[in-house]
């Protein structure tokens, strides 16, 4: 499996469908969705169970006592079966070609060079399609997150994936 799309959630049954609908619309289908519920009491479990019966793609759901997002992410990384780990927050929506774009960017990196990369990051847009934060200085740009911020002054929301083996 190529991607694990991971969603930590807490009392977000009212927004979680945005992620689900975005995943249903993806043109790239080699992914699983791992959800870690951080102690919700709002019907999240029933909502996810309904989606699991639809069997559109693999969905794993784990509920834990409320411990915070960082603990949920650690559990999600442990449960991940994909090679690449992408966090989609419980209110996120993304275009139908998002996973395909990430896949294409990753496979454009020669296999022999991939061990030197932690993942791929892209720009985020608001619902009107306006870029949130600063653009990168080039379409393809190799950098560390620290260099992006401190050396290049790139700020604002970004979204991307990391190699699962490094997240663990």
Where are these regions (language model features)?
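Nucleotide-sugar donor-binding/catalytic module of glycosyltransferases
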Residues: 1-168
């Amino acid at each position: 499996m190529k991607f694990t799309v991971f969603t930590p959630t807490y009392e977000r049954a009212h927004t979680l469908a945005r992620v689900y609908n975005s995943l249903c619309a993806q043109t790239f289908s080699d992914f699983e969705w791992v959800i870690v519920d951080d102690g919700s009491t709002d019907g999240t479990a029933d909502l996810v169970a309904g989606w699991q019966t639809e069997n559109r793609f693999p969905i794993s759901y784990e509920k834990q006592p409320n411990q915070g997002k960082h603990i949920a992410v650690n559990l999600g990384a442990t449960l991940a079966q994909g090679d690449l780990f992408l966090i989609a927050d419980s209110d996120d929506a993304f275009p139908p070609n998002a996973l395909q774009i990430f896949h294409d960017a990753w496979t454009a990196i020669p296999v022999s060079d991939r061990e030197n990369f932690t993942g791929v990051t892209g720009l985020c847009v608001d619902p009107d399609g306006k870029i949130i934060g600063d653009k990168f200085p080039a379409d393809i740009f190799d950098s560390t997150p620290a260099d992006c911020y401190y050396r290049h002054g790139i700020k604002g929301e970004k979204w991307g994936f990391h190699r699962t083996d490094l997240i663990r």
